From Swiss-Prot:
Top EC class, one word: isomerase
SUPFAM superfamilies referenced in this protein's UniProt entry, alphabetically: F-box domain, P-loop containing nucleoside triphosphate hydrolases
Localization of this protein: Nucleus; Chromosome
Summary of the function given for this chain in its UniProt record: 3'-5' DNA helicase and substrate-recognition component of the SCF(FBH1) E3 ubiquitin ligase complex that plays a key role in response to stalled/damaged replication forks. Involved in genome maintenance by acting as an anti-recombinogenic helicase and preventing extensive strand exchange during homologous recombination: promotes RAD51 filament dissolution from stalled forks, thereby inhibiting homologous recombination and preventing excessive recombination.
UniProt record similarity statement: Belongs to the helicase family. UvrD subfamily.
Catalytic activity: Couples ATP hydrolysis with the unwinding of duplex DNA by translocating in the 3'-5' direction; ATP + H2O = ADP + phosphate + H(+)
F-box domain boundaries: 185-234
Alphabetical GO biological process terms: DNA damage response; double-strand break repair via homologous recombination; negative regulation of double-strand break repair via homologous recombination; protein ubiquitination; replication fork processing
Keyword Hydrolase: yes
Organism encoding this protein: Gallus gallus
Primary location class: nucleus
Protein name, UniProt field: F-box DNA helicase 1
Keyword Transferase: no
Amino acid sequence: MHLTADDCEALSRSTEGLSSLTQPLNQRRSRGDVNRGLQPTHRTRTQPGAQGRQKNIMDYFKVSQRQQAVAGRTKDISIKEEVLDPFFAEDDESSISSVMETSGDSSSFLENEYMGNSRKRPLSSTAPGRLQIENDLWGEPEKKAVVVHPEHSQIKQELDDEIEIEPVPDSHYGLLGTRNWEVPQGSIEDLPDEVLRSIFAFLPVTDLYQSLSLVCRRWRIIVGDPWFIPWKKLYHQYLVKEDMALRRVEQVLQDFAITGQHKECILGLIRCVSTIPTSRNVDPSAVLQCLKGHHLFSRAEVCITNKLPHLQSKTGPEYMWAIITAMVLFSDGVRDIQRLMACLQRPCSSLSIVDVTETLYCIATLLYAMREKNINITNRIHYNIFYCLYLMENASVTAPQVVEEETPSSRCRQDFWSSSLSEVKLTHEQQRILNHKIERGQIVKIMAFAGTGKTSTLVKYAEKFADLSFLYVTFNKAVAERGRLVFPRNVTCKTFHSLAFGSVGKLYKEKGKLNFSKLSAYSVSFLIQNREGQSIFIRGKTVSQTLENFFASSDEEICEEHTPVWFKNTHGERKLVTPEEKRINVEEAKEIWRNMKKLDGDVERKYKITCDGYLKLWQLSKPQLSGYDAIFVDEAQDCTPAIVDIVLSQTCGVILVGDPHQQIYSFRGAVNTLYTVPHTHIYYLTQSFRFGPEIAYVGATILDVCKGIRNKTLVGGNQEGDVRGSMEGKITMLSRSNFTVFEDAAKLAGRERQIKIHIIGGLVRFGLSKIYDIWKLSQPADEREKANLVINDSFIKRWEENEGFIGLKDYATRVDDKELEMKIRIVEKFKERIPELVQKIESSHVLQEAMADYLIGTVHQAKGLEFDTVLIADDFVDVPCARDNNQRRPQFIIGMCPEDEWNLLYVAVTRAKKCLLMSQSLEHLLALAGEHFLRVELMGEAVKTGVACSTQQCTQTLQSGIRLVVKKLPLIHSNGSRDMGGYLCYSCVQKRFGSMTPLAFLPALQEEPIVL
């Protein structure tokens, strides 16, 4: 059935017609067919002169009258295709086009935006019809044989001769496709604009502007209509800071007193939302009746009745919207808002989904603007709304992405490698990547948050473009080996060092000139001259750093830019490297590098080339990786400038994949390639399949508060999760340093009941035997000889005959060797307990992770992995205390901490799948975003009599006459300490709840609305 503009007007005058088209599932149950007259009718006869003939939509309901076809009644409304407007050019970071005219008065702006809805007849709110089980999904219900009288048959033939029926699509308008053996009889193009608007409203705004608006002129007009999803457009325009959006939102904030100068600005937000124009068919009382089943309804009702009583007396929808807004503000998480939306989708509710989503976008816009204006309000509410809307707009892909066959290893650790990648259901973001075919010379960036399926995206990309040849390169050998198992045959998986070894490194191995370990200050000290100035060990450190910086750079020669800026003197004090010392460092480094490069060099003096050294030689040879159409660079955020130079010198296409917030190897010379390298195309993966909203919120808040990332938000799926103390599955303890790893291992191994532990990476890599050797070195020589304590490590054994433990400690301080200093600290702390602890840790340690009760490790070792439950140690960045505490140290500034430290914390948090136990410092960090784990409850539900405030050192008591009370939820920290939570007094709430406080405390009724 085709609908013209006249048909839509006629349809708007019919409740049955409008509701059948826009809400086909919400029809009143009846014995008859509620869609009678609306189902497409297949033509039985065509008359040449009747092209363009279409009857008024109301004529299809006049079943009692004989229909007469009059050719040429309607004009041909076919739309001529136009050249695409560059206004809709594809650029993910480009601002969303302005489709709404600027208005000086925000109230009129809101009214104009909803004029299209307010002047149309509202939708029906009847119950959905009964589904027939025997109906075929793709076709019509099986029709029973009917005996027709011959005279009736003749009448039907005459009607067929007289009535001209225009070709129409199938009953589903092509939305469900067709059987393989059927010829399509229609498509989505045949749907009326009213239905297309309802469909388009559910799509992400990026798809609307970068895909749908480019299909045809008709769709572009729909998307660009200022009456079409105005708040959704405004929200995304405000996020990218379009001037028009900034002005409009600022006007709204001023008109409704949503500013920092107004203590009750949150009430202004509610008043603003309550003014949203609503369809006349919406019955506010029926909607409120649907909401009564929600646990937040009674709290919102008490709040609005006491704070904004004038809204309750109005007969319009203002009170309804105020209740909904209060419920959103009181929501404890994403699921509260999802339940709210479910209540509003009940048959008794006459609100459309678009009405609800537009309201949520309105609230989200105002909340986001409040934080931008530094108004004290938690970021949790905005995050909950954004998360809920994101899942709704991407509803077809919110299920877990990869189905992995369970193995003993996968039960405790998942790293998303799977042989079932054919089961992958692509997200909108992933599909956009697959829609782009890489060309020669293109540089494509894929900015992928933690757990967003970047590997499976690359696998599907290679499968789609099977005619192309790809090279997948990474830094980790194990990752490359796993890649060979999951990528199709047109992908070659290598590490950068393996490529360099095949070309350069193998030559040095054959000559015995390959050193598989890194340069150390100790080894370099034997290759340099003992000159006046720095001590031999300190200069060995600065020269080794100069070489490492040169290896990581893209430069061809060693220069002073590669020398370190700081060094530690013999007293452990940081000093600037003088120009003279820089000159000496360059001279010594050049001499070592010249001897390293010689294949026939002096092996006895140990001028052996390192792995980074032959990688540097390979880079300087300007290699060309021929035979590939494109290169996948995994973990691109960890690329050094030398590797970047190799990649960018290729003529084929390049796809850089990684998470810029997981760069934790800058100390090795890595640069954040995803920020520094120019690109031709950029895509984002923001939805993680690893965790649910609770853990996703913590990760997103770290990026928000610590790194200022707000334009792209990390979200997860619908999985259950917890961050307040629950534990499920295998427990993993992640820390910043190996010192804490040893402490945790010692505590667990020292328990009476034997506990099986596994240190991620293994005991050898952890260096447990070196710790034992350092303890042996710390013992007097006669004691070592008496107890037959033999030092096995060659480096530590060298100090046995020289300066002993004191000399080793002095060396570690001078060369600033963090790992060695950490091991010495362990020995000094545990002293004589070291042999016992080492023995217990070794006996408790198991090789297989699946056999362990606890997994222990550093973030660097756990990068790329995921675990059921993660405990965050308290050795990360120390955030002193929450912002409401007057004793907080004022010198703590977020920006003073290195970015790598925040990245480490972000990586640690995003390893968790189900449960996350936070440190107290991490809880304090969330408090900087206004999140204190508070909940508003009815006083009657909480306590019957007045109770004391649960805050320590607070002596106030809650008043017994108040209707609402704020409760701090209990929380267990990763170190085992418990915050029991409890009810808070007014002054304590005011410190923590910020601008939300007026909603929770009701001192007096406001009989009249506030005049602005």
